[in-house]
Structures are given as C-alpha cells and as structure tokens.
Amino acid sequence: MNPESQEVASLMDELELVTKLDERTIEVRIRGLRAEVSDEPPCREFLYELMAFAFMESSATDASTWGTYFCPQMVFTNPDGSAREFPSLSNVDEETIDFWSSRSNQTSNMLMKARYSDLVWDLCFKCTGKKPSHTFALSSLDALLSLIENQLYMHSIDAIQKLRRAFALGISLSNQQLVERAKNAALNLEDKISDDNMPGLWGFCFDLIVDNKRVRKTSEEDRQIVADLEDRYSRLLSNGGLWPCECAAKRLGKYYRAKGMNDEMEKVITAFGELCLATAKDSPPMAAQQILRQAYSVYKQFNMNESLSKILTEIKELGPDLIDSMLTHEFRAELPKEELLKFAQEIVSGDCTQVFSRIVIHYLPSIRESKQRLDEGIQQYPLAFLFPRNVCDREGRVVSTVGPAETDYDGLLISQVSQDMAIYSVSLDFVLKRAIEEHSLGPQVIVEYLYASTVFPSSQRELLASGIAKYLEGDYLSANHILTPRIEVVLRKIVEQSGGRVLKEARAGGFYLRNVDELLCSEEMLNIFGSDICLYLRVLLSDPRGWNVRNDICHGLGVDACFSKTISDRLVHVLLLFAQLRPKTV
C-alpha cells in the first residue's frame, strides 16, 4: 500500500476534528498509511506530513545539534561511521517549507497550527536561506497558548514543554502582551497539574518567570511564586522524597543568593542536607553513599564549605560498611599446564635480549582487542552500560566514576584494559618465573640490560638494582616502593631527552614537576610510544579508573598494591619496555 495524496489529505481532515492530540499520535497514524515494505516512493504530501510530526522538540538540557529548536527523532550510525538522521534536515527544502506554510494557514486545529507554523519559523532560514515572516512565530505562539489555556494537551509534561516554547517565542518577538498571556497560562497550569512528589510538574513558573531576566514581572508576582515554592518545600521536608526536596531547595537557594539573603539561603540548603543525613542513616550503605553525595553536590553548588566537611566525614566513615555490603562475583578459567609450559618455553628460549623483548611485546595489552571485547559487551548487555559505575578503594572511598557508554566510552575502555591486564597477569607471572629460572637472572644481569638504554639515569642505578633484588627475593612490598618512583624518574628522563618539559609553574611561585599522567599524555610520549602503549601505562600507573599504582603506593592508599606480586610483575614489564629505547646505530 503506497498512499496517494488524497489518502493523506483524508487522514489529515479526520485528525483535524480531534481536539486533544499529540504529535506522536499523528505520526503513527500517518505511518499507518504506507506498507512497511514498499518499493514505490510515497507521494510528497506523505513525506511532508510525516516529517512535520516526526521532528522532536529540543530542551535546554538537550540542545539540537542543528542549532534549531527542532531536532531529529533518531540518529543512526552507518557502517562507515557516518551519522544518519531521521528526519533529516537535508530533506527539508523550499517546497517542504511552502507546504508547511500552506498547512499552517489552512488548519484550525491548534496542535497542528502550532507545529506547522513553528517548523516554518524555525527551519526556513536554516534550510532555504530565506527569512520567514514573523507572523509564523505569532501564529505558533497563539496556538501554543490556546492549547494550554483550553487544556487541549494529552500529557501534562507536553504542556510544560509547549509553555517553555511559548515563552521563548514571546521573548524573541519582544511582544510583552503575549509574554503576559504566557505568564498567566503558566500560573494557571502549575496550579492545575502540580503534585508535590512529581517535581517535573512544578517549578516551571519559577524558572520561566522569577529566574528569567528577560521576563518583566512585578515584585508581587515574584513574592507569590516564591511563597508557593516555600510552602511546597516545607511540605516536602515533612513527607517528600529527596529528589523533589532537592529541586525546591536549589531553586530557593538560587533565589535567596541572587537577592543577597545568605542566611535564608543557608537555612534552606542546610535543611536539605540534614534530610539527606537522616535518610542516609536509615538506608543500606550503597544507597546511603549516593544520598550523601547528593547532599555534597548541593552544598558545593552553594559554597557551604563547613557543611561540605561534615558530609565528607560521613562519607569516609561509611566506607567500611560500603565494602562489607558489596557482593563478590568470581569466575574460573583453566589453563592446561602442558600448553602453558610450551608457551613459556617459547618465550624464554634464546638469549636474555631476545627473552626480554618477547616478554615486552607479548604482554603489552592489545587495545584493539580490548575495544572489541568492550563493543561486544555493549551490544550483548546494553542495560549494563546505560548507567555509571563507581570505582571504590578498599576503604569504600569512591575514587572515580566510569560510564555510561554514551558519554564515557574512554572510561569504559580503561576499565576493560584494566580487566584484561588482570587476566593476563597469571601468564605473565609464570613466564617471568620461567625466565628467571632458565637464565639464572640476578639483579646485575637485569640492570645491565636496562642500562644499555640511555633513558635510565645513572643516579638511579643502585636503587634500581636494589628494587630488582627485592623483587627476585620475593619482597614485593619493598620492590614496589622502590621501583614505582624509579619509573616516574625514567618517564621524566624520556620526556626531557625528547625535548619536552617536565616542569610546570606553581601557583605560589617557583615550579612543580609535571605529574605522571601529564607526562604520559604529553606529545613527546605519544610520539615515542604511540597512543596504545601510553594508554597501557596510564591504566597501570596514573588513572584512577585503572590500577593507579603510582598514586596508591606513593600516597600509602593501597595496601593490596603494596604487597602484590602482580603489581611487581607489571613494574618489571614497564622497566623492560623502557629498555627497548636504544640509541640509533649507524
């Protein structure tokens, strides 16, 4: 079935008589005119009408990438990585605009008139280069307000969205009469639909009138809206949820701060913070931590430093309970001993130079494979990657947040590389032991190999020999504390030899040394090692989403890291990696 223009017109005439409609309903009805699989191109009227009601309306927190009010409903990624949108702005031409313009004049349905008129006003110049008449903005604004005033909306949240658009249009036109009409519509709407425990259905009068500098209002209007919000906040503190309370507290706090009423601001925000503390005490540790972080965020927004310190103390004290409440998930994998022995023998055969080079190459994480595993996980378990994850230390302190996939793919990749390194640690441990046994490796042999490279400062030789000796003796506590700072020294030497800078200006005068993560992100390191190896070093040494060895050991934060042979093996691997940097031979 491929609709003809007459069929489209008949459907639109039918919908014209329906007083309560939304754009989604119209879009679905239009789609129903066309067979799901059809080789015949649809008539132009079908495409024009479908696009008109398929466009989404953007919000202040989710702005359109086109720089317009309307935005695509869906964005697809093509196999070549390019984006494909529906509806696409490229399909809107002068004929499309003319069609919508004509429909705007023909229809008496308020929803349709608002949509057609606003499409012309919003997209005409963007798509055709021609400025539309301001009458389209006036027509859309009048229709939007009529919808709200006559309660012709299907969903309250849609009415609020249309009200926000009406304010934006009225302000852009500098039409004070219509802005006044929008103010009255807003006050009446909030009075009709507000529910204390549904914060999406109230507060918009404050946002659109009190907190909007471009809207003229009297002191009485301000006072009444704020008084209503204060009453609502009082009710919520008694029996409301944290989220509604936060929404009210932040609005009131912002208002009082702007008016210079700091005592009132602190009173409002403190009441919310105390509610968070009381709620956290009666909540499981994991929920309690999120509640305390919620309070911390609000206190920070309003620069209440004394209260911030109190919340931080509560978060720290909660740490052990948080760790105890976490579940342990284990997985087992078998490594056939014969295959492992055969593999290790292949690695350790030959002279020491060959062995060290093989170990370096084989145990560099494959970022490409980690990306592949991550992408497979996102595809197979999409829900698991929709939400952020907290990374905690052994005391329950949140040290970083990873994800979700849409906004923090890099963080998830670091987490994946970290997991892959842990899996390969068993094999690395076995191979290093075999190499030490096979070649009777002692501290001097390894140090001599390292110092064939020019990146190891002579001043660090004794300390490196001591750290390697402790590693070979099985004193991993000492080895980790000796070798970790040596790696940082070598990193600075590599950057210096490459013409980079290792100092940065201190705020109080003088200079600081650049930290490990800054060195690993430097252009010099990227030019020498490439992005994959630099990412590996960051995961191991400096990124809190990874192993973060340098931070944990040098700041005394990670007891496990201090004693870990797995960490020692990786530190030795990094030293061998650095040793691959040799002077050019002619």
Predicted regions and their residues:
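N-terminus-biased targeting/localization segments
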Residues: 1-286
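Short, mixed-charge amphipathic alpha-helical segments
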Residues: 452, 519-548
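Amphipathic alpha-helical interface elements
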Residues: 47, 103-112, 149-158, 196, ...
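Helix-boundary capping/turn motifs
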Residues: 88-94, 264-269, 287-288, 438-439, ...
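Short helix-adjacent coil turns
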Residues: 260, 283-286, 303-306, 471-475
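Charge-enriched, short contiguous segments at helix-coil
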Residues: 536-586
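Internal, Lys/Arg-enriched amphipathic helical interaction segments that engage polyanionic partners
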Residues: 293, 305-445
